[in-house]
């Protein structure tokens, strides 16, 4: 499994299949997904004094993230998104 370093977070992005009106979009018309599920988290950000600040999300959290955040990574036949904690916008209940 992927183990992110520092304040990085591994997400499994969730694609939206339909518009609010129920119209299915062509694959080239879709925007990059902005919601995902946290798969793994790093230990946190290290401050200048050496103190580690833990990441605010945990595995299994559903999150919103910036539209162009992170890097796509393929691992074991799956596509994941690796983002920094600062790229997360909110946790969805």
Swiss-Prot record:
Keywords: Chaperone, Cytoplasm. InterPro entries: Chaperonin_GroES (IPR020818), Chaperonin_GroES_sf (IPR037124), Chaprnonin_Cpn10_CS (IPR018369), GroES-like_sf (IPR011032). GO terms for biological process: chaperone cofactor-dependent protein refolding. The keyword NAD does not apply. SMART domains: Cpn10. One of its GO terms (molecular function) is protein folding chaperone. Pfam families: Cpn10. Its main location: cytoplasm. It comes from the Bacteria. It is found in: Cytoplasm. GO terms for cellular component: cytoplasm. Belongs to the GroES chaperonin family. NCBIfam families: PRK00364.2-2, PRK00364.2-4, PRK00364.2-5. Heptamer of 7 subunits arranged in a ring. Interacts with the chaperonin GroEL. Together with the chaperonin GroEL, plays an essential role in assisting protein folding. The GroEL-GroES system forms a nano-cage that allows encapsulation of the non-native substrate proteins and provides a physical environment optimized to promote and accelerate protein folding. GroES binds to the apical surface of the GroEL ring, thereby capping the opening of the GroEL channel. This is Co-chaperonin GroES. It comes from Limosilactobacillus fermentum (strain NBRC 3956 / LMG 18251). The lineage of its organism: Bacteria, Bacillati, Bacillota, Bacilli, Lactobacillales.
